[in-house]
Amino acid sequence: MLLNQHQLELARGRAGREGPGKCFRLFQECEFDKLAESTVPEIKRCNLSNVVLQLKALGIDDIIGFDFIEKPPRTSILKSLEQLILLGALTDDYKLSDPVGKQMSRLPLDPMYSKALIVSSEFKCLEEMLIVVSMLSVESIFFTPREKLEEARAARKSFESTEGDHITLVNVYRAASECLEKSKNASAKEKTMEKALNRWCWENFINYRSLRHARDVHSQIQGHVQQMGLNLSSCGDDMVQFRRCLTAAFFLNAAIRQPDGSFRALGTGQSVQMHPSSVLFRTKPDCVIFNELVRTTQNYIKNITRIDPLWLAELAPQYYATED
């Protein structure tokens, strides 16, 4: 994948470093000339909401006038300020809100995930939201070897929820925890328990490293929310309550189905498609919330859960006005 001229020049410099060598580029020089000279700094191409939130927590009010090492676009700063106001982290006069904004700034997460954890405490499903945030913070939890495609699909079906991907992730995490609990009863040795979990992951086509990472993230975030005094509760099997909580947390990422089967992201107005990896891919619900927008040849939404569209105006009236 061609990135920029500077990186390609660095690669060329490796030829001949340890001994005689040559560098061959499998593209024309005119293509090289079209590339950017260097990588655009991350702060100029990423969501700045967490950066802005942390600066506000440090008492810095003038974000636009702040002396960044690399100045991000003004529009990106304004967009982040607007998002933080909608999430309740900032007041209308751009001050850090109390308690929500202060709580969000204490969590080492994307502000939307931080808000999700705070909201879930009110909805009495913090345990489930901890799982979802942890699982979304790591690489894909599923793996599908080409030579065992059908077996992997069959194994995944045992975890799938007809309500969407978030609850599917909860099901995987709960099943893994049950496996660990069983092995703990059989043997108190940690190494034996990890071997049992590794074997369970292999049998169910779950990425063991990703799952272990998710469990570590879960433990870390749980420590933060407990220090903040949030109510660590579970909704059990009441997934309607959990989906309502997801709506209240991720209302900025809602999409509604169009007559042609595509979706329209309500926050941006973009036409988007459901990613084939979603458990809802073949069902096409009327309204969903999602966590990720992937741009390839098309705009795809990933990590999706079906919701009732009426919940949007009920749970996020600051963003969705109802029509008389």
Label every PLM stretch briefly:
Residues 27-324:
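Second RecA-like catalytic domain
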